[in-house]
Every structure is written in structure tokens, then in C-alpha cells.
Amino acid sequence: MALSLLSVFIFFHVFTNVVFAASNEESNALVSLPTPTLPSPSPATKPPSPALKPPTPSYKPPTLPTTPIKPPTTKPPVKPPTIPVTPVKPPVSTPPIKLPPVQPPTYKPPTPTVKPPSVQPPTYKPPTPTVKPPTTSPVKPPTTPPVQSPPVQPPTYKPPTSPVKPPTTTPPVKPPTTTPPVQPPTYNPPTTPVKPPTAPPVKPPTPPPVRTRIDCVPLCGTRCGQHSRKNVCMRACVTCCYRCKCVPPGTYGNKEKCGSCYANMKTRGGKSKCP
């Protein structure tokens, strides 16, 4: 950057010097022009020759002040910081330290402590009473009187008695009776048990037809009324209601009344989706 500025300044200075020299040469050429000599007429009349003055130059070249050219300032070379090197001192060998001689400890035998004889108090033993076992009287088994079997009597044989025939009495002669004609037996058909009249099955009221999701909200509100997680039940019920166009009556069961679409709809995990 400094060199480029220096070169531009030198070029400008040389250019101004050249222009100034050219303007000086032009002014010198105008001054040194020869004066024209007119032909002299008759010597009788000589007009006075006017003294010609050199024309003054109408243009003076501008004088530019010469600025002294400063030599480029060179920066001193930057010396890198010198890291002080600490001289490495050789290791000083320390003389070996002599330890004082270790004296073996003097062993003193322990003085035996003489304990006085401990006087034990006389132990009193209570007399052990002699326990006599109770005399158990021998138990006599109960005497049962001997059972005397009754004497066996021989069976008495009775001679057979001859049957006594009753006296034969001749029945009185009855006049012949005319027998009525035999009627064939009448066959009564089996009586069928009378069944009580069965009441026709009561059909639950059919819910109104579902058209939009707004129609499913009141139906699913009654369906999920007793569910522990009502919000989850409502989302699943509204989806099933919108797809199958039906919600089973009641709060539980009766899925077959909405067909296989409602009963067989599964989640991604394979569980039943519709409540």
C-alpha cells in the first residue's frame, strides 16, 4: 500500500515538471521571434518606426509548489519475543544420610501379678425333697354278667291237616239274559298341553339415522355415559358411528345390532375399537 502511494506521487511530480518545462519553452519562443522589416519607401518621407515591444505572454503557467518527497519509512523488523531459557542445573548428588544404629529394644519380663485367692462363699444346696409318685390303684375292668343264650327248642312238626271242603250248593237257575251288543272302544286323542300366550319381543327404539359426525355426538354420549375414560370412549365411538352409521343402544353390549361393521372393527393392535 505504501509503495503504490509512493509510485503515484512520483508520477504526478514528474508530470508537473514536464508540463512546466514545456510552458517555459513556448514563452521563450514567442520572445525570440524576429521583427518584420517593412520595405523602405522613398527617402523623402520616412515614417517613424514604432518600437516593437515583445508581447507579454497572456498565459502564465501555474507554479506548483514542490513538495519534498519523504522517503518511505521502513518499519524496523519485528523481533520475535525471546523466551528466556532457564539453565538446567545438573542434579546435585546429596550425600547418603547415615541413619543412627537401631538398638534392639530391651525386653523386660512382665512382673507377675499375684492375685489373692478368691474366697468363694459356700454354696447352699437346698435339700431335694423326695417326691413320692402317687400310688395308683389298679383299675379293675367292669364285670359284665355272662350272657346266657336261651335254650334252642327243636321245631315242633305238625301233621298236615286235610283241607275241609265246603258243602257244594247248587246255584239257582237264572233265566238267560240277553247281552247287549259290544261297542268298540272309543279312542280319545291325547290332549296337547296348552301353551300360555307368548308376548311378542319388545324391540328397543331404533336410533335416528346417522348422517354426520354431529349426529353421532348425542348417541355416543349415552353410550359412553358410564365409561371410566369418557373422552377416549367418545373419540372411538364417534369414529365407529361415522363409518358404520349406527350406535348400539345401551351403555354396553348389543354390538350385533349394528352389524359386522361395528362389531368387527379392530385397532392396529388387534383389539376391538368400537365401545
Swiss-Prot record:
Q: Has keyword Acyltransferase?
A: no
A GO CC annotation given for this chain:
plastid
Q: Where is the composition biased (Pro residues)?
A: 36-207
What are the recorded Gene Ontology BP terms? gibberellic acid mediated signaling pathway; regulation of reactive oxygen species metabolic process; response to abscisic acid; response to gibberellin; response to salt stress
Question: Which controlled-vocabulary keywords does the entry list?
Answer: Disulfide bond, Gibberellin signaling pathway, Secreted, Signal
Task: Spell out where the chain crosses the membrane.
Answer: none
What's the stated role of this polypeptide? Gibberellin-regulated protein that may function in hormonal controlled steps of development such as seed germination, flowering and seed maturation.
Query: What protein is this chain from?
Result: Gibberellin-regulated protein 14
